[in-house]
Curated annotation (Swiss-Prot):
Enzyme Commission numbers on file: 4.2.3.5
Pathway entry: Metabolic intermediate biosynthesis; chorismate biosynthesis; chorismate from D-erythrose 4-phosphate and phosphoenolpyruvate: step 7/7
Any single Gene Ontology cellular-component annotation: cytosol
Protein name: Chorismate synthase
UniProt-listed SUPFAM superfamilies: Chorismate synthase, AroC (SSF103263)
Molecular function terms, GO-annotated: chorismate synthase activity; FMN binding
Chain positions recorded as FMN binding sites: R138, A139, S140, Q259, A260, G303, K318, P319, I320, S321, T322, R344
Listed transmembrane segments: none
Cofactor dependence: FMNH2
GO terms (BP aspect): amino acid biosynthetic process; aromatic amino acid family biosynthetic process; chorismate biosynthetic process
Taxonomy, superkingdom: Bacteria
Basic and acidic residues: bias regions: 275-286
Organism listed in the record: Nocardia farcinica (strain IFM 10152)
Role this protein plays: This reaction introduces a second double bond into the aromatic ring system.
């Protein structure tokens, strides 16, 4: 099945700008440049970020698809300018440059020592590059700014069509973890963002900061785990009919597509695999407004479909591969032992990864909602949602006095 909502990004880390194009969004969704800028500012948050975050401005320009603060039904194009572009106009020029002009530029020195864990090595071989610059410019996590921009339109759609919010928090950084099991709601998002590490527990926050400081002192980097939650989704987004239509498989693909993400779990995920069946599933009982669940171990997804419980998905981020204490590698020009190149980088970008994960979850859930409910305008989509919710609420599992009139 061809996706109703599609997105693509373009641009390099030190190019003039990043561009996001979102195709298939209904008309009438309220979104502004300020909305996108606010989400990009959240992406720059986090203890352990590098120097680039201090001057990255992320100037947003809505290039197409939006007029007077509302989508028009056509592709939405968003440009996010790179504030460092003036320093790179020659080195990253799209047009040919005189080699003599490039020869004396330190920024243009070939990068021939690939970083273990990065795209450098495989990218150089696959695309026949002698310079890793051609790989790392696109492989850089700077590209996620464009995804956050597109995700802002999707999260605004979800809020306006379904009344739901997408939130995230950091569960672990290195060995420091939040073990309380308490999950933030939409009302807690501001509190989470106020935490330097976007943790929803004061004790965990202190431990995470200490972990980052220790890694920084040792010239090292850290990874961690983020969790994304979406409350209030109706039953039935996604499908059991094929693997590609299962919402959990689509969420996993979207999250694994984020730079440095190495694992995804839905609900209790791998912990569920260690339980017996009687302790692994969410038992059901009649309630005043329909079915109630005693737990949410499934993370709001059963059989590839939302089940009415909060959607809960986690992503594991590996430590950043640009390690200040450079790792051993091979020089691709000489074939000799070498130490890996070092580009300016973060000690830890896990807090920012949570914001990027929110954007990807918003895009996938919005895609599933548009596939289910259709419509060319927000008004039409909302009418379709209302009709669907009313229909499933007339089933016997909902008491008669709680059914929509």
């Amino acid at each position: 099945m061809e996706a109703v909502l599609r997105w693509i990004t373009a641009g390099e880390s030190h190019g003039p700008a990043l561009v996001a194009i979102l195709e298939g969004m209904v008309a009438g969704v309220e979104v502004t440049s300020e909305d996108i800028s606010a989400q990009l500012a959240r992406r720059r948050l986090g203890y352990g970020r590098g120097a680039r975050m201090k001057f990255e401005a992320d100037k947003v320009t809505m290039v197409g698809g939006v007029r007077h603060g509302r989508t028009m039904g056509g592709p939405v194009a968003i440009e996010v300018a790179n504030s460092e572009w003036p320093k790179w106009t020659t080195v990253m020029s799209a047009d040919p440059v005189d080699p003599a002009e490039l020869a004396d530029l330190a920024r243009n020195a070939p990068l021939t020592r690939p970083r273990p864990g990065h795209a450098d090595y495989s990218g150089m071989l696959k695309y026949n590059f002698d310079d890793a610059r051609n790989v790392l410019e696109r492989a850089s996590a700077r590209e996620t700014a464009a995804r956050v921009a597109a995700g802002t339109v999707a999260r605004n759609f979800l809020r306006q069509a379904l009344g739901v919010e997408v939130v995230s928090h950091v569960v672990a950084i290195g060995t420091a973890a939040n073990t309380t099991g308490v999950v933030p709601t939409a009302a807690d998002l501001a509190t989470v963002d106020e935490s330097p590490v976007r943790a929803f527990d004061a004790a965990a926050e202190a431990a995470m900061i200490a972990e980052i400081e220790a890694a920084k002192k040792d010239g090292d980097t850290l990874g961690g785990v983020v969790e994304v939650i979406v409350e209030g989704l109706p039953v039935g987004l996604g499908s059991f009919t094929s693997g590609e239509n299962r919402l959990d498989s689509r969420l996993a693909a979207a999250l694994m597509g984020i730079q440095a993400i190495k694992g995804v779990e839905v609900g209790d995920g791998f912990e569920t695999a260690r339980r017996r069946g009687s302790q692994a599933h969410d038992e059901m009982r009649p309630g005043p407004d329909g079915v109630l669940r005693s737990t949410n171990r499934a993370g709001g997804l059963e059989g590839g479909m939302t089940n009415g419980e909060p959607l809960r998905v986690r992503a594991a981020m590996k430590p950043i591969s640009t390690v200040p204490r450079a790792l051993a590698t091979v020089d691709m020009t000489t074939g000799e032992e070498a130490v890996a190149i070092h580009q300016r980088s973060d000690v830890c970008a896990v807090p920012a990864a949570g914001v990027v994960a929110e954007a990807m979850v918003a895009l996938v859930v919005a895609q599933a909602a548009l596939e289910k409910f259709g419509g060319d305008s927000l008004t039409e989509t909302v009418d379709n949602i209302t009709s669907y919710v009313k229909r499933i609420s007339t089933r016997p599992h909902v008491p008669a006095d709680s059914r929509p009139q």
